Amino acid sequence: MSRRHKAERREVIPDPKYGSTTLSRFMNSVMRDGKKSVAEGIVYGALDVVETKAKHDPVDVFIQALENVAPAVEVRSRRVGGATYQVPVEVRNERRQTLAIRWLIASARARNEKTMVERLSAELLDAANNRGAAVKKREDTHRMAEANRAFSHYRW
C-alpha cells in the first residue's frame, strides 16, 4: 500500500435519462472494453422491457432489485494460528451496492435468453420479486455467515 497519498475517489456522473448515480454505476459495470454506448443501450433497453412488463417505474424496480440482492453480512478469511477461519463481518453500504450490482450482472450474463437486454430485464424482474440467481447468491452468502457465527469473535 502506498504511504504517500490515498487514491482520490472519482465522482460518478448521473445517467442522462433518469439522473441516477446508482444507475450510472450499474451501467459502468455492464460496460465492456470501454464501450459505454453499448452498455447504455443494454441497460436502457432492459429498463424499457421492465417498464412494459412490470407496469411500474423502471428505476423503482431497479432499486428494489438492488435492495433484494444486497447482502447484510459476508464471510472473510482470517488466519489464526495455522488455521484459516471464515469470519462473518457486516458489509459496508458502498460494498453492499457494489456486490449487488456485480451479482446482478453476473447472474444476467449466465442466463439463457437470447440477448443481454432480455437477460438483464428478466434478472431485474426476478430480483425485484425476490427470485433469481442473484438473490440465491445473497442467500448463500448469508447462510455461510450464519454457519460460521461461532468465529465472529475473530472479527477485526
UniProtKB/Swiss-Prot annotation:
It holds the Pfam family Ribosomal_S7. Keywords: Ribonucleoprotein, Ribosomal protein, RNA-binding, rRNA-binding, tRNA-binding. Part of the 30S ribosomal subunit. Contacts proteins S9 and S11. SUPFAM superfamilies: Ribosomal protein S7. Gene3D superfamilies: Ribosomal protein S7 domain. Signal peptide: none annotated. GO terms for biological process: translation. Belongs to the universal ribosomal protein uS7 family. One of the primary rRNA binding proteins, it binds directly to 16S rRNA where it nucleates assembly of the head domain of the 30S subunit. Is located at the subunit interface close to the decoding center, probably blocks exit of the E-site tRNA. CDD domains: uS7_Bacteria. The keyword Ribosomal protein applies. GO terms for molecular function: rRNA binding; structural constituent of ribosome; tRNA binding. It comes from Xanthobacter autotrophicus (strain ATCC BAA-1158 / Py2). The keyword Disulfide bond does not apply. GO terms for cellular component: small ribosomal subunit. This is Small ribosomal subunit protein uS7.
